[in-house]
Amino acid sequence: MISEIAKLAALVLTNTVKVDDFLQSSKLPPPTFHEDGPIDLGLSPEVEAARVAAIESSLRLHDLLXGPVELIRPTVNAXSLEAIYKYDVASKVPIHGEIPIIELAXQCKMNEPDLRRILRFAIIHHRVFQEPRKGIITHSAASRRLVEDSAARDGLGLQFDDAWQSFARGFSLAHNTDKSVFEYMEAHPEKAKRFAGAMSSFSSYRGHGPEYLARGFPWASLGTKTVVDVGGSEGKYSIALAKSFPQLKFIVQDLPAVVRAVNAKRPIPLELEDRVTFMEHDMFTEQPVSADVYMFRFVFHDWPDKYVVNILRRLIPALKPGARIIISDSILPEPNTLSELYERKIRALDMVMLSFFNSRERERDDWERVCQEVDPRFKFVDAWVPEGAALGIIEAVWQPEPTMEXPKAIESDESSSTGVXDSAKGIKGMESNGRNGXISVTCVDDVDVN
């Protein structure tokens, strides 16, 4: 009888051959650790599925062969990346060149034996840098990205300086503050700038592009309608949708600082200026626009349920019968229903949301429950994840009963605009959505995480 490890090895081989055959037939470069290696392989959906299957099989094979003792050892792998980030090692290594470790240590103001150990650990665990000859360092594809992609550097910094501390204690305790994440960033411009860069990096990951939102919902079936993009930042997704669906008009709403920055940059193509407009609006205040569709992309995962409910209740005075609410956000899978690779990533993101914002990613049932809590007239329609997309789509429709009275939005310091700082996106042009309410992340014991 064939063992599981042999089956996994066969799956790794079979799926890797599919990827390799596609790359060769398409005359695309294969993946390599060399500094000129491709960042994205350009695979078709079918071959992308084979790539993911090969990775998943190899991960399971690795864990089985390592055994249970290895699986419960604390991880120290990221310590080398933290040092590489803090000492900006990558920028000191020439592109298409080489540098002796002893010279690199002098430029980084580091002890040479320590740097040598750190680099060799990073090379073997993360494929960051290469050592073609003893004591000589060159770039790998991964380390070169740290030089040429500032958002990738910001992503590391956010993880090491903010996320790690927050994982251990919660954001507010870790940073000795009673402010929420966004308030804290507002008071620390250098962290806000890095946060913005990190969000830009994360939004470039596989499955996050506007094309997934465009393909994942039947926008063409709406007809000639107006879509309000609440918390839409620079309007990247509204602009993309407007290009694909000429019958739709978009109003992108965000805080005044964001709208002023957008107007100064004027990112809207000339041919779309009559169909994509910007409007100052705080989503914790009453919605002033009566429209056909309200879109929230990647807004709600920053917020605990009670704030999401409050934001949606602010729409009610403007809603007309049949108005749709389209939410593009994470949908946690049921255990063992999706690929292990995807589930690992989304559950890691869920832990980040817990530690940073005292919020969470939500399952389908959570989204349905939130809609019901907002108002019985919010009818949950469906929730799904488009093929290849990192974010799901949640659809609700407003179906009022003539005699029903709308529930009032929660009045609290957190939802008041007085004394509350701008949204994450309002800080140095952050792409992260959400408004800065006074959420004190000081204790995670009482958080309901399903």
From Swiss-Prot:
Annotated residues for binding of S-adenosyl-L-methionine: 254
Lipid metabolism listed as a keyword: no
Domain of life (superkingdom): Eukaryota
Stated name of the protein: Grayanic acid biosynthesis cluster O-methyltransferase
Function (record text): Non-reducing polyketide synthase; part of the gene cluster that mediates the biosynthesis of orcinol depsidone grayanic acid (GRA), the only major secondary metabolite known in C.grayi. The first step consists in the ring and depside synthesis by PKS16 leading to 4-O-demethylsphaerophorin, involving different orcinol-like rings, one with acetyl CoA and the other with octanoyl CoA as the starter. Further depsidone formation by the GRA cluster-specific cytochrome P450 leads to 4-O-demethylgrayanic acid.
Pfam family for this entry, one: Methyltransf_2
Organism ancestry: Eukaryota, Fungi, Dikarya, Ascomycota, Pezizomycotina
Gene Ontology process terms (BP): methylation; secondary metabolite biosynthetic process
